Amino acid sequence: NLLQFNKMIKVETGKNAIPFYAF
């Protein structure tokens, strides 16, 4: 699931969540 993947990236990246969330 892409949404779950993005959510995981947000947690992993922290402050860098914004650029990854853009994808």
UniProtKB/Swiss-Prot annotation:
User: Where does this one sit in the cell?
Assistant: Secreted
Which free-text remark accompanies the cofactor? Binds 1 Ca(2+) ion.
Q: Does the keyword Calcium apply?
A: yes
Q: Which cofactor does it need?
A: Ca(2+)
What does the PTM comment of the record read?
Contains 7 disulfide bonds.
Q: Which domain of life is it from?
A: Eukaryota
Q: In which tissues is it expressed?
A: Expressed by the venom gland.
Q: Name one GO biological process term.
A: lipid catabolic process
Q: Which reaction does it catalyse?
A: a 1,2-diacyl-sn-glycero-3-phosphocholine + H2O = a 1-acyl-sn-glycero-3-phosphocholine + a fatty acid + H(+)
Q: Which GO terms describe its molecular function?
A: metal ion binding; phospholipase A2 activity; toxin activity
Report one GO cellular component.
Answer: extracellular region
Q: List the disulfide bonds.
A: none
Q: Keywords of this protein's UniProt record, alphabetized?
A: Calcium, Disulfide bond, Hydrolase, Lipid degradation, Lipid metabolism, Metal-binding, Myotoxin, Neurotoxin, Presynaptic neurotoxin, Secreted, Toxin
The reply on keyword Secreted is yes
Per the UniProt entry, the Enzyme Commission number(s) are 3.1.1.4
Question: Could you tell me what this protein does?
Answer: Snake venom phospholipase A2 (PLA2) that shows presynaptic neurotoxicity and low myotoxicity. PLA2 catalyzes the calcium-dependent hydrolysis of the 2-acyl groups in 3-sn-phosphoglycerides.
Something else known: Negative results: does not show myotoxic activities.
Give the family per the record.
Belongs to the phospholipase A2 family. Group II subfamily.
Protein name stated in the entry = Basic phospholipase A2 intermexin
From what organism does this protein derive?
Answer: Gloydius intermedius
